[in-house]
Amino acid sequence: MTSEQYSVKLTPDFDNPKWIGRHKHMFNFLDVNHNGRISLDEMVYKASDIVINNLGATPEQAKRHKDAVEAFFGGAGMKYGVETEWPEYIEGWKRLASEELKRYSKNQITLIRLWGDALFDIIDKDQNGAISLDEWKAYTKSDGIIQSSEDCEETFRVCDIDESGQLDVDEMTRQHLGFWYTMDPACEKLYGGAVP
C-alpha cells in the first residue's frame, strides 16, 4: 500500500448541494423518533444499542464503541438530552469536518479513526486484522443504512483500496473521511446507492 493510495482530498466543499443532501439524508435516517430533531441519545441508540448489540459485541467492545460514538458526534456539537435541528446539525458537521481534516493532515488520530477502530474490532469476528466480505455483509445488515447486497458489495469494493479482497481500518478511515468530510471523488458510491 502506497501513501498515495491513502491520500485524501483535504478541502471541504460545504456549499455543494450534494454534500448537504448527503448529510440531510443521514439526519433523517438518524432521527429515530421522526420529530425533525436529533440528539446524542438517538445517535448512541442507533449506532451502538441497535447495531452493536445485533453484532454480538462484548461488553468491552460495546463500551469502546459507545465512547467513540459519543466523542465523534460530540465533536459535531451533539449532547445528551439536547435536541438539535437541521441548521445547527449541519453547522456542527462543518466544524467537525474542519477539525478532523486538520488532524488528518498532521497525521494525528481523528475521531472518525477512533470510531473506526472500535467498530472494526467488532466487525472483524475472526480477529485476523481484516474484514472479509462476509463480515462486512453481516455488519451492513445490522446497521440498516445499506439495504441491498449490491450496495453492500459496492461499498466493500470502494473501501478495498488495495484490492486485496479484505478491508483494513486504514482503508475504511480514509474512504469515510473523504465521503463524509470532503466529497473526495475516490469515495463516491461508498454506500452504493443507499446514501447520495
UniProtKB/Swiss-Prot annotation:
One of its GO terms (biological process) is bioluminescence. Keywords: Calcium, Disulfide bond, Luminescence, Metal-binding, Photoprotein, Repeat. Residues 18-53, 54-108, 111-146, 147-182 form the EF-hand domain. Aequorin is used as an intracellular Ca(2+) indicator. Aequorin has a number of advantages over other Ca(2+) indicators, for example, low leakage rate from cells, lack of intracellular compartmentalization or sequestration and it does not disrupt cell functions or embryo development. Ca(2+) 2 binds at D124, D126, N128, E135. The keyword Calcium applies. This is Aequorin-1. It comes from the Eukaryota. GO terms for molecular function: calcium ion binding. Residues 47-57, 62-72, 107-117 are annotated as: May interact with the chromophore. The keyword Repeat applies. Coiled coil: none annotated. The reduction of the disulfide bond is necessary to regenerate aequorin from apoaequorin. SUPFAM superfamilies: EF-hand. Residues 1-7 form a propeptide. Ca(2+) 3 binds at D160, D162, S164, Q166, E171. Belongs to the aequorin family. Ca(2+)-dependent bioluminescence photoprotein. Displays an emission peak at 470 nm (blue light). Trace amounts of calcium ion trigger the intramolecular oxidation of the chromophore, coelenterazine into coelenteramide and CO(2) with the concomitant emission of light. PROSITE patterns: EF_HAND_1 (PS00018), EF_HAND_2 (PS50222). It comes from Aequorea victoria (Water jellyfish). Ca(2+) 1 binds at D31, N33, N35, R37, E42.
